[in-house]
Structures are given as C-alpha cells and as structure tokens.
C-alpha cells in the first residue's frame, strides 16, 4: 500500500492487474426450494447476474433447491454452488452429474468434499462435468501447489486471511 501511495497507483496496478470491473456473486442460503427461489428473484431484481448457492445440508433436496433457483434466475444467470465440504466423493460426482443432466447450468462447485481429502477432490474433478473450485483445502502455498500438481481441482480460491496475507497469496 505504501508503494501505491508513493506512485499514486492502486495496489492492483502494482501487481499487474488490468481489470476495471470484477464479477461478484450473492449467496443464496440453504432453505426450502420456494424460499430459495424467492431469494433468487430478489437478487436478480437487485442486479446480480451471478449467484452462489449453498448446498449440501440435505443432498436429497439439493436438486429440487437448484431447480427452483435456476427457474427463478432464468437461463442467463450464472449459478455457482458451494457444498462446504458436505459430500463424499462418490456422492458429489453423482449429484453433479445429475445437475448436468437436468440442465441446471452450474458454473462451478466449491469445495464439494472435506478439505483434507485431496484424493477425493481429484476423484470429483476427474469425473464431473462441473468445474471444481478448491477453497477450504488451500491454507498455504504448499497446499495450492499440491492441488495443482495432482490435478485435484480446476480452480483455487485463495483467501488472504486464511493463507497469511497478500504476500503468501502471490
């Protein structure tokens, strides 16, 4: 930040960033499908094009919830799902493939399996049409490297607070 102040540049420019606009999402929390559909309509009315939907609390209901969200969102909105480590690898693949078959248009799934289960994450990544985002699995640069080397995820979410700040994130 001091260099940014010295050179009168935002920190993102100092690190080579060129985007003027970023995509953000709004979280649709787990609830009854009807409530989630209403929350989705409210988010769309507020201008959100990307929705992050919490799933995993009751996998049997996840398809119904996501169907309701997709119907409320329409075909042009992006839907990301966050399972918060709730599924086992086989369950994740089964559910994600069912979502694909139903045409729910899921952009990505965040942390479908427990954080420490890198092999399970890889299992899902190799067998699902839905791209997998590692989140809770990444606590350090070594974790990120291991996940990339293993091919355990398609994407990595780096949280600055979790990994020790901007320097470690880079």
Predicted regions and their residues:
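Catalytic core of soluble alpha/beta enzymes
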Residues: 53-170
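Residues that scaffold the ATP/ADP-binding catalytic core of kinase and kinase-like folds
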Residues: 14
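Metal-cofactor-binding active-site regions of metalloenzymes
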Residues: 25
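Metal- or metallocofactor-binding catalytic centers and their adjacent structured scaffolds
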Residues: 1-6
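Catalytic domains of carbohydrate-active enzymes, especially glycoside hydrolases
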Residues: 42-54
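Short, conserved phosphate-binding/catalytic loop or strand-edge motifs used
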Residues: 17-22
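Active-site beta->alpha loop and helix N-cap motifs at the rims of alpha/beta catalytic domains
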Residues: 28-37, 42, 59, 63
């Amino acid at each position: 930040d001091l260099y940014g102040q010295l050179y009168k540049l935002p920190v993102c420019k100092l690190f080579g960033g060129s985007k003027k606009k970023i995509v953000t999402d709004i979280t649709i929390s787990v609830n009854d499908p009807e409530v989630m559909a209403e929350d989705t309509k409210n988010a769309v009315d507020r201008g959100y094009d990307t929705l992050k939907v919490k799933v995993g609390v009751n996998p049997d209901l996840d398809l119904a919830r996501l169907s309701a969200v997709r119907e409320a969102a329409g075909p042009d909105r992006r839907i990301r799902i966050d399972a918060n480590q709730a599924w086992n690898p086989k369950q994740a693949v089964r559910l994600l493939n069912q979502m694909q078959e139903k045409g729910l248009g899921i952009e990505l799934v965040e942390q479908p399996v427990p954080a420490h289960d890198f092999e399970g994450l890889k299992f899902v990544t190799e067998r699902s049409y839905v791209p997998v985002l590692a989140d809770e699995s990444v606590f350090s640069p070594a974790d990120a490297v291991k996940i990339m080397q293993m091919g355990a995820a398609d994407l990595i979410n780096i949280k600055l607070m979790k990994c020790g700040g901007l320097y470690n994130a880079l």
